[in-house]
Amino acid sequence: MARHPYRRLRPAKSGFPEVGISEEGNIRSLHLGSDTVQSSMNLDHPSELVLSYSRAMMGWLLFTDALPQHITQIGLGGGSFARWIDTYLPDTRQTAVDINPQVIAIARNLFELPFEGEKFEIIEADGAEYIKVFRHNTDVILVDGFDGEQIIDALVEEPFFRDCRNALSSDGIFVTNWWSGDKRYQRFIERLLSVFEGRVLELPAESHGNVAVMAFQSSPKEQNIDKLKKRADKLSNAYGLDFHRMLAGLKASNPNNGKHFHL
């Protein structure tokens, strides 16, 4: 397929950034207000996690003993997580929340979202407000909220982190995509450490300075690095992602004694 340059599909509405799309080869990408890629889909393999940050955001699977019953996504984008979860975690229910109706419309029309029903629902709402309705009944929260220029402020404030912690089940995990080059990055980390009582891990993505930051409702039962390596073997085979690379990234970026993490 010939390369198609970024083009505007929907004009900005109600203060939201305009939504655009581009295609290069078999990769279709979503943009918000600029040519920066926010989400991508492989047209031949729609469930593939094309962007490195989206793969890093699956690193939480290393630390869970039971597959999640429910996952909340704040920021639908092009539906990368929705497609992957529908394919690889088919028994997990998903709720995807996005404030921008244009993003939702384009994702439905052009990004092969899962069937909307009991297992997958889309909510048009402010994710920071919507998460307040949950009380200890969602197992994983995936946050990927950019406005085309930077992280959405409401999604990096302490009140939002507290609401997310209140929403998580007893062994729940919060995962967010941040950019390490943001001058406020360390401030965001300190807020998260405060709310989750130090149970935070950073996993750098393979490119572009993105970091998948994970925060844990309670200490993961398995923190032994050798045992996590064995778990990485099983996960890599099951899900087609490089969990050994993820584990190495976690080990290099977080305090440990070479044998255990300290969460």
From Swiss-Prot:
Record-level GO BP terms: polyamine biosynthetic process; spermidine biosynthetic process
InterPro entries, per database record: PABS, SAM-dependent_MTases_sf, Spermi_synthase
Catalysed reactions, semicolon-separated? S-adenosyl 3-(methylsulfanyl)propylamine + putrescine = S-methyl-5'-thioadenosine + spermidine + H(+)
Write down the superkingdom of origin.
Bacteria
Q: Name one Pfam family in it.
A: Spermine_synth
Q: Name where it mostly resides.
A: cytoplasm
* Signal peptide start and end residues: none
Q: Which SUPFAM superfamilies match?
A: S-adenosyl-L-methionine-dependent methyltransferases
Q: Which PROSITE patterns match?
A: PABS_2
List, in alphabetical order, the Gene Ontology terms for molecular function in this entry: spermidine synthase activity; thermospermine synthase activity
Residues the record lists as binding S-methyl-5'-thioadenosine? D98, D126, G127
Q: What is this protein called?
A: Polyamine aminopropyltransferase
